[in-house]
Amino acid sequence: MAKEKFERNKPHVNVGTIGHVDHGKTTLTAALTRVCSEVFGSARVDFDKIDSAPEEKARGITINTAHVEYDSNVRHYAHVDCPGHADYVKNMITGAAQMDGAILVCSAADGPMPQTREHILLSRQVGVPYIVVFLNKADMVDDAELLELVEMEVRDLLSTYDFPGDDTPIIIGSALMALNGEDDNELGTTAVKKLVETLDSYIPEPVRAIDKPFLMPIEDVFSISGRGTVVTGRVERGIVKVQEEIEIVGLRPTTKTTCTGVEMFRKLLDEGRAGENCGVLLRGTKRDEVERGQVLAKPGTIKPHTKFEAEVYVLSKEEGGRHTPFFKGYRPQFYFRTTDVTGSCELPEGVEMVMPGDNVKMVVTLIKPIAMEDGLRFAIREGGRTVGAGVVAKIVE
């Protein structure tokens, strides 16, 4: 039978496996591709190929990540799996692979372990909105009470980090059985099929960038005689139409202006859309009233802030980061979208110093306000060199 051509008509959803080392994340990833290839007709990917994930760079950080894809009846899934714990930490903090939902793999034989907890915490900090649980290796547990106990522990852990533990779907099965095409007691293929159906029903369809409120980070500002001030940048999300009112947010007090023209490749358009590089003409705004590092946004949708809680990964020496630890009161530059702003770091109680290669929660206070919201990524730099990556976990003020 001829292979069907790739259809882009199904909604696209990004997921990934998280959980403790050796609980079966990669086996489940391989099993998902196998089951979906048989049931829904997508391509199968073998375990070894996923396990020897290639290195990639995100914001100058080396991360090993395997990307696979599979289809359900109604969706196309892109799935990330990381071989090592450090790769997960980096992946989630840099947003190299943003997840619309995560599959938490937990061994029924061992129950929740330190990285189970850490990955749930990271999911909360970086804004992974939904978690579905796969209790793996259930073929190795004969005791129904033990299974129930592990399930309760996982639910408690999810609730601890503000996920709806009581309502989280938990599928019990064996990834290895599913990978080998076995299905005793419906723990193999059936369980993985059930997992895919749960992803379909439990993770809502993500809002596309174009459907979100307009936002464009300003990269450059020009004044064109007789026309006024033009700011250029890449539209991050939404659409800006000519004659719409927009706000200029960040670095200075927020001001309102009107878009009087959109230009792309020297052509005049009536709108600029998510993903496009364009110039936006601003009515009545002077050249020195806007600067790189501010954003154009739909009025009322984003505010400037200076203080926030962040989850940060500090580059190791091998990654070109610092060679020495830093202490409280550390004052690097924080690079948001298009600009650096100096800020000071407050470390959690009991943490005296942060070593290269660590991840840490910190409270940052910037010297100038930046347009921000939870989930915004940033880099930490010293004199233009990246020494860390972070994500806004919670805005303080």
Swiss-Prot record:
Q: What does this protein do?
A: GTP hydrolase that promotes the GTP-dependent binding of aminoacyl-tRNA to the A-site of ribosomes during protein biosynthesis.
Identify the stretch(es) annotated as G4: 136-139
Q: Quaternary arrangement and interactors, per the entry?
A: Monomer.
Catalytic activity, EC: 3.6.5.3
Residues binding GTP are 19-26, 81-85, 136-139
Q: Region G3: which residues?
A: 81-84
Segments for region (G2): 60-64
| PROSITE patterns for the chain | G_TR_1, G_TR_2
Q: Which GO terms describe its cellular component?
A: cytosol
Record the organism: Stutzerimonas stutzeri (strain A1501) (Pseudomonas stutzeri)
Question: Which SUPFAM superfamilies does the record cross-reference, listed alphabetically?
Answer: EF-Tu/eEF-1alpha/eIF2-gamma C-terminal domain (SSF50465), P-loop containing nucleoside triphosphate hydrolases (SSF52540), Translation proteins (SSF50447)
- So what does this thing catalyse? GTP + H2O = GDP + phosphate + H(+)
Domain of life (superkingdom): Bacteria
> What is the name of the protein in this document?
Elongation factor Tu 2
